[in-house]
Amino acid sequence: RILSQDDKTIPLLPVSTKATTAIPTYIAGGVSTAYRFVTPDNVEKNLSESTFKKVSKEVLDQVKGVSSLIKYFVMTYKNPNLDGLSILDTPGFNSNDSEDKERTIEVINECDALFWVFDVNAGTVNRSSISLIKEKLNKPLYVVINKVDTKPKSEVDKVEALISKTLKDAGLKVEKYIRFSAKAPLEDIMAPIKSVGSTSENDTFVEDVQTDLEGLSKKYEST
């Protein structure tokens, strides 16, 4: 909902409890809608909207070698929710694909905070994800319990208690637990996101993307 602004015409990233995001994808506000990808040697290339929509983990699994040619995607469009904010969607820690995990590890600490989203209906915490986050993450951790409108509050309380105990027992510090759903006010998720201060000292990944976005904005402003 942050990305779509509750507008059904906005292209969305694939969403599932399974690993669906194929390649780290940066989403940011811009003067116009644009899709690009950046190669491992930092060469920027334009991408059509139709191609962007077709890229999924399933597709890349079928076309071997393509994912190694793309460092990350950048999607920009007009969105007041993204003023001063960029969201990085990653393949995730809970993927069974070792390459997905490596991609996530490579970029995760370039962000100011990690928002770990749990489906309230899943009911479990992935142990391998906990191990990787504990070992690799050195940024603030927030837990988002999503789809809370699909269960009674008493059940949501139990899920949060289970997640909290599991992470605490594993030695993971959680800055805040956030409950969210399709019916909740967008501010319920935007407020904690915007409260996160910049913590990165060497934001090379972020700086590269911001430079790309500034160049794109100037290009459109001059035309």
Locate predicted features:
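Globular "head" domains of long coiled-coil molecular machines
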Residues: 1-215
